[in-house]
């Protein structure tokens, strides 16, 4: 199973690269995470073309948006288990300063939000990678996640 994060933004601060790399390297080889950075453009429509081109063929798409459906970590773990069992690759989309173009949200299989708060895309990237790792640890019975 391959998890891809297509995120608008480049030249992230060092702390973003450090944090995302730390969680990515903890993931097993059969559940890898790849981040594809898209250079910001003047309009979401122009970004949408670049984002769509970065989505791996056959991947299911989840658009992250502040108006998306709330998720829990437990639900993410359940989803992750299902995707692995069914052999799906998943791509998460993180928009830039103006969010995702409506066409990307319409074509996505789901639209989620990471928080009721509006997050900068750098923070959303770190939060998503951490939650994917946390979901994986739940499935493995690893003590990282505590309730």
UniProtKB/Swiss-Prot annotation:
A Pfam short name: SPOUT_MTase
Keyword Metal-binding attributed: no
Keyword entries, A-Z: Cytoplasm, Methyltransferase, rRNA processing, S-adenosyl-L-methionine, Transferase
Reactions performed catalytically: pseudouridine(1915) in 23S rRNA + S-adenosyl-L-methionine = N(3)-methylpseudouridine(1915) in 23S rRNA + S-adenosyl-L-homocysteine + H(+)
Subunit architecture: Homodimer.
InterPro entries for this protein: Alpha/beta_knot_MTases, RlmH-like, tRNA_m1G_MTases_N
Encoding gene (name): rlmH
Annotated signal peptide: none
Transmembrane region(s): none
Sequence positions that bind S-adenosyl-L-methionine: 64, 95, 114-119
Function: Specifically methylates the pseudouridine at position 1915 (m3Psi1915) in 23S rRNA.
Keyword DNA-binding on entry: no
Official protein name in the record: Ribosomal RNA large subunit methyltransferase H
Gene Ontology CC annotation, any one: cytoplasm
Organism: Polynucleobacter asymbioticus (strain DSM 18221 / CIP 109841 / QLW-P1DMWA-1) (Polynucleobacter necessarius subsp. asymbioticus)
Enzyme Commission identifier(s): 2.1.1.177
Subcellular localization, as worded in the UniProt entry: Cytoplasm
GO molecular function, one term: rRNA (pseudouridine-N3-)-methyltransferase activity
Protein family membership: Belongs to the RNA methyltransferase RlmH family.
């Amino acid at each position: 199973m391959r998890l891809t994060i297509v995120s608008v933004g480049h030249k992230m601060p060092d702390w973003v690269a450090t944090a995302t790399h730390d969680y990515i390297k903890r993931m097993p080889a059969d559940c890898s995470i790849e981040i594809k950075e898209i250079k910001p453009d003047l309009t979401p429509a122009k970004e949408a073309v670049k984002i769509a081109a970065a989505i791996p063929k056959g991947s299911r798409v989840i658009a992250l948006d502040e108006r998306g459906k709330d998720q829990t970590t437990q639900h993410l773990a359940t989803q992750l288990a299902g995707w692995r069992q069914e052999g799906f690759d998943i791509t998460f989309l993180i928009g830039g300063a103006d969010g995702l173009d409506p066409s990307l949200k319409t074509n996505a299989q789901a639209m989620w939000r990471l928080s009721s708060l509006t997050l900068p895309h750098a923070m959303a990237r770190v939060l998503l990678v951490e939650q994917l790792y946390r979901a994986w640890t739940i499935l493995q019975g690893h003590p990282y996640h505590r309730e």
